[in-house]
């Protein structure tokens, strides 16, 4: 983003956790403690000021023929518009042949974005874990993840390039939108 020469309207902070488990040792309850600590204790001032938290999990692996963005429900409409109507939203090339699904996929507790979402920050994560039904994990998690088969060979340059372009464009779109487009209809309907 810096190399592109883009001049943001708002501050853009790159927060590199490295893993949701950072920040706790010698406990079986390390899941997402680092992200929780970051938003609740290290930078609680981000709540109410942050337009969006864009999280990446395994951004260079092609899990299936499609991708999606999991998010807070109030972001579903904005993400649908961005993916399907916004002129500068990139399409996948050389990966995700079925494109970007935008039916509205709820964020969940398996990644850093949930801690930010729970604290009140509109949050997203690339669709990396669950399939369309939002109940079945991609086979990667049963066959490869955290095993001896999880090697550099899983890296897919086209997927990485797409995710950088797509979420970079999304960050710029959010930055340039005078008021963040949030739609609370799906929350109301629950």
Model-assigned labels for residue ranges:
Residues 3, 10-12, 130-189:
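His/Asp/Glu-rich mid-to-C-terminal helical/loop segments that flank catalytic regions of hydrolases
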Residues 1-10, 41-49, 85, 89, ...:
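Secondary-structure transition/capping motifs at alpha-helix termini
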Residues 19-142, 156, 182:
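Metal-dependent peptidase/peptidase-like ectodomains
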